[in-house]
Amino acid sequence: MASHTSIVKAGDFILRTPVLRSIFVPAAKLFCAYSGYRQLGLKFDDLIHEENPTVQKALSRLPKDEIYARNFRMLTAAQCGITHHLLSADKALKPSEDTPYLLPYLLELEAEAAERVELDNVEVAK
């Protein structure tokens, strides 16, 4: 499985390359529009599989207000699923509101893990 860091690097490469950007950015916007998670009130970071130890640690580092907002979005989406209804257009999440809140913590944790592995494999020269 690819790490979040490698996915971000690939995304940055796509955004720096004009030809790839002209292909992938409209496709990504179309995918987000048709996936329907915003009509349930969810942000993209809410879709990250949370039974991963790295994600669990990142969730524990979130500020209290962000944890509350995440839980509220999850409960709203669950209620929409139970009732088989989508949120109205004024209550659905706008694309401008879909900002990453968990990804910075995940990247920080992956950098810490890489640094830990590097320090564990240091050979001391005498």
Curated annotation (Swiss-Prot):
Subcellular location: Mitochondrion inner membrane
GO biological process: mitochondrial electron transport, ubiquinol to cytochrome c
Pfam families: UCR_14kD
UniProt keyword Transferase present: no
Entry keyword DNA damage: no
Signal peptide boundaries: none
UniProt entry keywords in alphabetical sequence: Electron transport, Membrane, Mitochondrion, Mitochondrion inner membrane, Respiratory chain, Transport
Topology term for the membrane: Peripheral membrane protein
Record GO cellular component, one term: mitochondrial inner membrane
Subunit note: Component of the ubiquinol-cytochrome c oxidoreductase (cytochrome b-c1 complex, complex III, CIII), a multisubunit enzyme composed of 3 respiratory subunits cytochrome b, cytochrome c1 and Rieske protein, 2 core protein subunits, and additional low-molecular weight protein subunits. The complex exists as an obligatory dimer and forms supercomplexes (SCs) in the inner mitochondrial membrane with cytochrome c oxidase (complex IV, CIV).
Family affiliation: Belongs to the UQCRB/QCR7 family.
Its job: Component of the ubiquinol-cytochrome c oxidoreductase, a multisubunit transmembrane complex that is part of the mitochondrial electron transport chain which drives oxidative phosphorylation.
Entry-linked PANTHER family: CYTOCHROME B-C1 COMPLEX SUBUNIT 7, UBIQUINOL-CYTOCHROME C REDUCTASE COMPLEX 14 KD PROTEIN
Name used for this protein in its record: Cytochrome b-c1 complex subunit 7
Gene designation: QCR7
